[in-house]
Amino acid sequence: MKWTALVIVAVLQTQFPVTAAQSFGLLDPKLCYLLDGILFIYGVIVTALFLRAKFSRSADAPAYQHGQNPVYNELNVGRREEYAVLDRRGGFDPEMGGKPQRKKNPHEVVYNELRKDKMAEAYSEIGMKSDNQRRRGKGHDGVYQGLSTATKDTYDALHMQALPPR
């Protein structure tokens, strides 16, 4: 059905060609030059308007002075600072609501500094587990990688059933 429709459309296109761009004169070089000129003039005008708007904003800024528009009067607080200065008094933490920070024990600190002398001993040699330390499974330990002993025992107790053929 699809092939017959495709063949019919192909035969009709060969007998009655769709009007080409040449019949309308759209490939005439004079028309292309005219359209290029219009596009160039449009680009120059848009660029001039953009530059005028960009550099003339300083003259438009004093249009909303104090007292003219009540919407903008609410925003004028009379000070030049845009942001408040945090932590003017030393020792106060803004994350704790401005309350003074209490001195923490070194054991209560979340992040401890790295001590290279102690770390060098721990990571100088990484040992391998001996055979008696490894847990021996039923021969397919690769399936159970990363499971705890309790979870591994649960999986060992389950019997795998073969999937039915499709």
UniProtKB/Swiss-Prot annotation:
GO terms for molecular function: identical protein binding; protein homodimerization activity; transmembrane signaling receptor activity. Residues 126-156 are annotated as: Disordered. Keywords: Adaptive immunity, Cell membrane, Disulfide bond, Immunity, Membrane, Phosphoprotein, Receptor, Repeat, Signal, Transmembrane, Transmembrane helix. Residues 22-30 are extracellular. It comes from the Eukaryota. One of its GO terms (biological process) is adaptive immune response. Residues 52-166 are cytoplasmic. The modification Phosphotyrosine is found at residues 64, 72, 83, 111, 123, 144, 155. The chain crosses the membrane at residues 31-51. One of its GO terms (cellular component) is cytoplasm. Phosphorylated on Tyr residues after T-cell receptor triggering by LCK in association with CD4/CD8. It is a single-pass type I membrane protein. It holds the Pfam family TCR_zetazeta. Residues 61-89, 100-128, 133-161 form the ITAM domain. Belongs to the CD3Z/FCER1G family. The TCR-CD3 complex is composed of a CD3D/CD3E and a CD3G/CD3E heterodimers that preferentially associate with TCRalpha and TCRbeta, respectively, to form TCRalpha/CD3E/CD3G and TCRbeta/CD3G/CD3E trimers. In turn, the hexamer interacts with CD3Z homodimer to form the TCR-CD3 complex. Alternatively, TCRalpha and TCRbeta can be replaced by TCRgamma and TCRdelta. Interacts with SLA. Interacts with TRAT1. Interacts with DOCK2. Interacts with SLA2. Interacts with SHB. Interacts with ZAP70. Interacts (tyrosine phosphorylated) with SHC1 (via SH2 domain). Interacts with PTPRC. Part of the TCR-CD3 complex present on T-lymphocyte cell surface that plays an essential role in adaptive immune response. When antigen presenting cells (APCs) activate T-cell receptor (TCR), TCR-mediated signals are transmitted across the cell membrane by the CD3 chains CD3D, CD3E, CD3G and CD3Z. All CD3 chains contain immunoreceptor tyrosine-based activation motifs (ITAMs) in their cytoplasmic domain. Upon TCR engagement, these motifs become phosphorylated by Src family protein tyrosine kinases LCK and FYN, resulting in the activation of downstream signaling pathways. The ITAM domains mediate interaction with SHB. This is T-cell surface glycoprotein CD3 zeta chain.
